[in-house]
Amino acid sequence: MGEAAEHAWVMEPRGTASRHWAEQQCRLAGFEPDVRFETADLQAHIRLVEAGHAVALLPDLVWGGRPPTVELVTLAGDPHRTLFTSTRTAAAARPAIVAVRELLARALAPVSP
């Protein structure tokens, strides 16, 4: 990640958990990121990276089963996050809840450890 120290960065807005995590990853790599672009829209992150205007830390899920269009670099330490759903016990068997959980499981399967 140190090679990205001299590049412009795109990150989520200040105050978000993902921004805090990304800044900490940069600091652990020994640099303060030069954040020139800020947006919560991860598709905008991808477009800025594709155009060569910025580098970014993006979750694997953004590629949605399609091949990446930019060079990917694996981060040290195998960082990951856990996604979960919760419902009231009485609502857990509702068809809409079951459908959403099944769709999430299918969508996340390609990037799950």
Predicted region positions:
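Residue-level recognition of oxygen-bearing side chains
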Residues: 17, 41-44
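Short beta-strand-to-loop elements that line the ligand-binding cleft
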Residues: 11-12, 32-41
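Secondary-structure junction motif
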Residues: 1, 7-29, 93-101, 108-113
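Primarily hydrophobic membrane-targeting regions of prokaryotic envelope proteins
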Residues: 26, 37, 46-47, 103
